[in-house]
């Protein structure tokens, strides 16, 4: 078992069970919102680790975009190893937890499937990570002496935070819509292939049945009596 490498939050690490981080595995760039799409082979399980501070909010949303049944097993565990969420054969889910200090683990399990691989999308939304409090402290040193202004820096800060929150929510909705669109497109393509296959089967059956019927009708009118000389 190799050594585990942990990066400062909110960088996310990819691992495969047995719980060993893949050598050279790339992490996410620091961001409060991160999304990732990956392919989980049949009979495999993939786990991710997310370091979190105290009293922050961790929201995980996942969807199965492609694969037979569009289902997966999901497991979320606390830094102490306590199971927080365990779902079986689900196509999507949303879970929010108030965090404590430590590394949260969440896994996607496809071991129940022996043939079909799954394409999985998930998104992390991290709130109350401490950056906002630090930003407010940075702004406070510019507030002194601004009472003469028509608009105080507190008002500007409030407007900026409101715009930031709405832009973040808009980006989150767009990401989810792209995931839904990808899953619907995969379902439509699968249905298209299935309809074409069975249409060809029906066509072949119809041709064979028609040929048999023609042969049987023709045989009814044939004179099989032998003429005497």
From Swiss-Prot:
Assigned keywords, A-Z: Endoplasmic reticulum, Golgi apparatus, Membrane, Protein transport, Signal, Transmembrane, Transmembrane helix, Transport
Source organism, top-level taxon: Eukaryota
Cytoplasmic side: 218-229
GO CC term (a single one): cis-Golgi network
Swiss-Prot/TrEMBL GO biological process terms: Golgi ribbon formation; protein transport
Membrane topology: Single-pass type I membrane protein
Domain GOLD: start-end pairs: 45-126
The protein's assembly and partners: Interacts with TMED9 and TMED10.
Family: Belongs to the EMP24/GP25L family.
Name of the protein described by the UniProt record: Transmembrane emp24 domain-containing protein 5
Lineage: Eukaryota, Metazoa, Chordata, Craniata, Vertebrata
């Amino acid at each position: 078992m190799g050594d585990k490498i942990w990066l400062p939050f909110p960088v996310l690490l990819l691992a495969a069970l047995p719980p060993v981080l893949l050598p050279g595995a790339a992490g996410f760039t620091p961001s409060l919102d991160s999304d990732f799409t990956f392919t989980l082979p049949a009979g495999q399980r993939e786990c991710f680790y997310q370091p979190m501070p105290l009293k922050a909010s961790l929201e995980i949303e996942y969807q199965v975009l492609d694969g037979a049944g569009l289902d997966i097993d999901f497991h979320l565990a606390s830094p102490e190893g306590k199971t927080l969420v365990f779902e079986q054969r689900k196509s999507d889910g949303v879970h929010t937890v108030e965090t404590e200090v430590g590394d949260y683990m969440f896994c996607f399990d496809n071991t129940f499937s022996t043939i079909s691989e799954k394409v999985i999308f998930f998104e992390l939304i991290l709130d109350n990570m401490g950056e906002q409090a630090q930003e407010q402290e940075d702004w406070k040193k510019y507030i002194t002496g601004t009472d003469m202004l028509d608009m105080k820096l507190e008002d500007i800060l409030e407007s900026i935070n409101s715009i930031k929150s709405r832009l973040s929510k808009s980006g989150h909705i767009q990401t989810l819509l792209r995931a839904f669109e990808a899953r619907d497109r995969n379902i439509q393509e699968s249905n298209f292939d299935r309809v074409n296959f069975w249409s060809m089967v029906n066509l072949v059956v119809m041709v064979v049945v028609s040929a048999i019927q023609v042969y049987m009708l023709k045989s009814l009118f044939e004179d099989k009596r032998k003429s005497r000389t």
